Amino acid sequence: MTERVATTLGLYPLPDWAKDELSDLKGHQKSDLVDGSEGPEVREAYGRVREELIDDQRAAGLDRVVEGQGRWDDWLAHPLAVHDGVETGGIVRYYDNNNFYRDPRVVDDLAVDGGDVAAELDAATGLLEDDEPLQAVLPGPYTLAQLATDEYYGDESEFLAAIAEFLAGEVAAFPEHETLFLLDPSLVTEPPADDANERVSDAVDTVAAATDADVVLQSYWGAHEEKTYAHLMDADVDAFGFDFVAGDRDTHLYNVTEYGTKDAVSLGLVDGQNTAVESPDTVAERIDWVTEQIPSQTFDTVYATPNTELAYLPVSTYREKLAVLGEAVELAAGTEVSA
């Protein structure tokens, strides 16, 4: 019987009260964004944000709980933006939308330097009940390398390997977690060159090997090029995540049919950037439709997720979409998935 899991990619919108309070506490300039050296008042405010974001997931009945990433001012570049070997540069557009992040300029060795993300997850663990499984979230190594500027290593291969080792060190410091989602949208928005595909797969392996949890490599805002997908099949992850909102569904299905997939799958079925709220029935139907298109495999686990981070949405809409996911998985749970 296939397990259906309602979860998200993290990076939630800040509650309205927190936007005002944190703006007053931190300041309004680029230099005031999170860099890992926040004072006690700022940390306490983010602690209340974390508690509220976890309560939102609990109320929605999600099957995995993320920390929420309320501190990630620099989106997926956050783990580098707080690193001692990184200097944050100018503002850069975050993919093809109206959000921005500080360019993380890597100027020194990317040794593990304190486990910023691990500390967030430790705090989240303290808020969970015994039966609430934690889901960790990190940028995938290729995406983090693409978002950064290398001013230290001087070689793309060496830089990607260093990013992967840095992320693996972060993961090794994590508290116990049920799943790890590696968010790697650049795999489809800026696909690796043909001669880099194998290195990218190896980098994913490096990060995945650092945990005993199930690892999901989630891409969005497109579909994988054929060669990229074929090489990623060699990566030792438990599931690939596919964007069935903004990605080309025919390309997804072609890749899976031609090259196979893993024993679990993550389906981005709820629009993380559109305020229109899907119905639970519609999302449940999408779960069944996607899994019915590939009659060669029965998935052990199907993760139902938004297609992107949710920080683009108003708080009220984000909460509605969480509830839709929780209810949709319940509706879809009565039938076995063959795919």
Regions found by a protein language model. Give the residues of each.
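Domain-level signal for soluble alpha/beta catalytic cores
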Residues: 1-339
